[in-house]
A protein has these predicted regions:
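Short, intrinsically disordered, charge-balanced linker/junction segments flanking boundaries
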Residues: 330-343
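Extracellular/periplasmic, surface-exposed regions of secreted and cell-surface proteins
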Residues: 1-309
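Short aromatic-centered micro-motifs
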Residues: 88, 320-321
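A generic structural motif
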Residues: 288-289, 325, 334
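Short linear proline/tyrosine/threonine-rich motifs used for host-factor recruitment
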Residues: 318-320, 327-329
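Terminal low-complexity, poorly structured segments
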Residues: 53, 136, 315, 330-332
């Protein structure tokens, strides 16, 4: 069964003074709790041919535990959000806006300071087409410059701040099984939100009675505290763990062009063109030397790597260059990569 309780409270304010000043504000609070309970039962001894069920007698208690008749699981999470937005416009030409958001979740570290993340954004717009020195330009309907900056947060639901283990029955000696819990993930009391800081600058243009509209956006996104693999010393008992420490940068441009080609009472023809370019780079990451996923430091995410060929040897086997620029066979290269991964 899935259950959820949500409590929301919202307030809005809007006012206009002397056709010059416009003020808008909004506040909202949301508290949500979800829980999931699963119960399953299994039966043994059913014969599909006779459509009858025969009792199954296990030779001992250990064997019976390998085939449980009843399973139950329970998951519970809580979220809280508090946010507000506001904007001020002067003479319908200059607009300043901002927002503040405070999100919290019990999915993060034991320390309370990691459970909440303050988010914010600021933005501005200058509508040049309404300026007196451009107002008389008949072919220009809209020309606006805008910019924004803000920070966003993300939850990785595949991680946990607590010790994770697998309960299982293992065979120690022939005919004998033991119950055990295998620890698969070490605890992480500092697990926290993934953060992304975004700066965007854009321009909007509309001409010829808005028959042609153009929007261009340039953006830079710097992501930090990303959940990524960090190698650990062997003394810890784990080879690696997922922690907040990787960083990534995205830069790009997005262009949108819309045209109204024909517009009559019986027929309308409009076209839209979109172009987007994005370039990303892993700024901080740590993975074994012989791995390339999810991304190597200094390269784009999902970059494709290839070995530099050095031709073939006298017997026709391929040769490759190692890091020192020496020619090695494929077998030698694999041994070097394996040694580098273990080191």
């Amino acid at each position: 069964t899935n259950s959820q309780i949500t409590w929301k409270l919202q307030g809005e304010y809007s006012a206009k003074f002397a056709n010059t000043h416009e003020v808008e504000a909004m506040h909202r609070t949301e508290i949500r709790k979800t829980w999931y309970k699963s119960i399953s039962a299994n039966g043994y001894g059913y014969d599909r041919k006779t459509l009858q069920t025969k009792p199954v007698i296990f030779p001992n208690e250990t064997w019976a535990k390998l085939y449980p008749l009843y399973n139950e699981s329970y998951v519970e999470n809580a979220f809280a959000s508090f946010f507000a937005t506001g904007s001020y416009t002067f003479k319908q030409r200059y607009t300043l806006g901002g927002s503040v958001r405070f999100d919290g979740s019990d999915m993060f570290g034991v320390a309370k300071k990691y459970r909440f993340l303050p988010l914010y954004s600021v933005s501005g717009l200058w509508r040049l087409s309404d300026e007196p020195w451009l107002e008389e330009t008949e072919w220009l309907n809209n020309l606006a410059l805008r910019a924004s900056y803000g920070i966003q947060g993300n939850i990785d639901k595949n991680t946990s701040s607590y010790v994770m283990g697998d309960y299982q029955n293992v065979t120690i000696l022939p005919g004998n099984t033991e119950e055990m819990i295998s620890v698969s993930t070490p605890p992480n009391s500092k697990l926290r939100w993934e953060k992304t800081k975004t700066f965007t600058a854009g321009v909007d243009l509309g001409v010829l009675n808005n028959a042609i509209n153009l929007s261009v956006d340039f953006y830079t996104r710097n992501s930090s505290d990303l959940i990524a693999t960090q190698l650990l010393t062997l003394e810890s008992g784990f080879a690696s763990m997922l922690v907040n420490w990787a960083s990534l940068r995205n830069t790009g441009v997005e262009i949108s062009i819309g045209t109204r080609n024909i517009h009559t009472k019986d027929f309308m023809w409009m076209t839209n063109f979109n172009f987007a370019y994005n370039n990303n780079k892993v700024l901080r990451e740590q993975i074994p030397e012989n791995q390339t996923t999810p991304g190597r430091e200094g390269y784009p995410v999902g970059a494709i790597f290839a070995l530099k060929s050095a031709g073939i040897d006298d017997e026709g086997y391929p040769l490759f260059y190692n890091k020192q620029g020496e020619k090695v066979t494929a077998t030698e290269l694999l041994k070097l990569n394996a040694a580098g991964a273990s080191n």
